[in-house]
Amino acid sequence: DPITAALSQRAMVLGKSGELKTWGLVLGALKAAREEQVTSEQAKFWLGLGGGRVSPPGPECIEKPATERRIDKGEEVGETTVQRDAKMAPEETATPKTVGTSCYHCGTAIGCNCATASAPPPPYVGSGLYPSLAGVGEQQGQGGDTPRGAEQPRAEPGHAGLAPGPALTDWARIREELASTGPPVVAM
């Protein structure tokens, strides 16, 4: 991609291989953010490139002026964003509607006594469906056998490995490496 080519050419001309590593981290992190469907603002925050923001950007962080002023026939009229939003909001409120209110026992919709007439379930008596786990901890220290599954290495966070599901990016590790190795990075 053209950004990577330009950065690598600049690093070669200036002779700064550390800069290549830094920008490689940034590009890799942004690619991972794209794959994880993270917004660019959120990725910038995680990388510490948010321009001094303390909290992650979100809908509540969007800066809006407290009042908007407009001039009507020489008069200044102040209108708060709350008043403006109230004007634009639809008047009808959504009421929750219940769908399929019929009884699953008898099929009647109104006047069913099935739920109130049914007896409570019998108490649990330990039917023996599951084997007892008593003594399992005692067996661990004895014998040279490793427990089943212990021989498989676990995948580290942020690295694709044997872990099931999609691997997530370790943003804290990337931010630490950027802070320690890289040149000062200006907010994008």
UniProtKB/Swiss-Prot annotation:
Span list, region Disordered: 77-99, 130-166
Site features described as Cleavage, chain residue numbers: 104-105, 115-116, 126-127
GO terms for cellular component: virion component
Motif (PPXY motif): 121-124
GO terms of molecular function: structural constituent of virion
Pfam families: Retro_M
InterPro entries: Gag_M, Matrix_HIV/RSV_N, Retrovr_matrix
Compositionally biased residues, Basic and acidic residues: 77-90
Protein name: Gag polyprotein
Organism: Avian endogenous rous-associated virus-0 (EV-2)
Gene responsible for this protein: ev-2
